[in-house]
């Protein structure tokens, strides 16, 4: 009885996400990330490590350019960028196993790579969060409650989306797109500039 009531409550919370998204827009987006970080991890998940590394490097360079000219600026930019990538991985894992879990599960049923990514998105954050409360709850119970909570909330979000005929609560919010575009535009401009073109004789 208590478990059913709790599940209904979590589904109800998820169902309200559509109305909140329609009222407040991107403020309540399920995932808010810099574009380069999202692109980096998406590329790694798709098995494109070179593209993922390029996006991560673009993120670090864009951050480096925004920092004030202080000693060891490049090292600080690399450190902050690394922390940002870890945070991005955590946010995307949460999105994949919570709000977007029906789509993640469907992908996992037809793709071995998607299955591995989903398992990692479930296992790694679960172990990390359980370790902090390991003295008060065993791993099995913690994992079961976490998965049940995420599944109920995510089901509620999709239920609300279909009932409200709006998928605003499912859309991610990507930030810092302009700086990334400017960075790639600069790279492209240098790569295609006449000075870099091979001379013809």
What function would you assign to each model-found segment?
Residues 167-201:
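Actinobacteria-biased recognition of intrinsically disordered, low-complexity terminal regions
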Residues 43-163:
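Membrane-embedded multi-pass helical conduit in multi-pass membrane proteins
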Residues 10-17, 75-81:
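Juxtamembrane amphipathic/hinge helix adjacent to a transmembrane helix
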Residues 19, 23-26, 160:
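Negatively charged linear elements and acidic catalytic determinants
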Residues 36-38, 144:
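Alpha-helical membrane-protein architecture signal
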Residues 29, 163, 167-170:
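Structured alpha-helical bundle/scaffold domains in large eukaryotic membrane-trafficking regulators
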Residues 24-35, 46, 94-99:
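Membrane-penetrating hydrophobic segments
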Residues 1-7, 16, 20:
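Active-site donor/metal-binding and catalytic loop motifs
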């Amino acid at each position: 009885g208590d478990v059913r009531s709790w599940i209904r409550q979590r589904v109800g919370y998820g169902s309200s996400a559509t109305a909140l998204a329609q009222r407040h827009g991107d403020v309540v987006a399920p995932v808010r990330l810099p574009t380069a970080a999202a692109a980096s991890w998406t590329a790694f998940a798709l098995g494109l490590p070179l593209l993922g590394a390029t996006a991560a490097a673009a993120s670090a360079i864009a951050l480096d350019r925004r920092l004030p000219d202080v000693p060891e600026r490049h090292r600080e930019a690399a450190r902050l960028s690394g922390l940002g990538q870890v945070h991005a991985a955590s946010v995307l894992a949460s999105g994949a196993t919570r709000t977007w879990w029906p789509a993640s599960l469907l992908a996992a049923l037809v793709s071995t790579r998607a299955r591995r990514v989903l398992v990692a998105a479930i296992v790694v954050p679960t172990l990390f969060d359980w370790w902090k409360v390991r003295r008060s709850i065993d791993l099995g119970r913690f994992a079961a409650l976490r998965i049940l909570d995420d599944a109920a909330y995510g089901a509620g979000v999709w239920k609300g989306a279909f009932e409200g005929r709006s998928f605003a609560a499912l859309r991610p919010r990507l930030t810092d797109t302009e700086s990334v575009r400017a960075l790639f535009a600069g790279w492209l401009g240098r790569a295609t500039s006449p000075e870099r073109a091979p001379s013809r004789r």
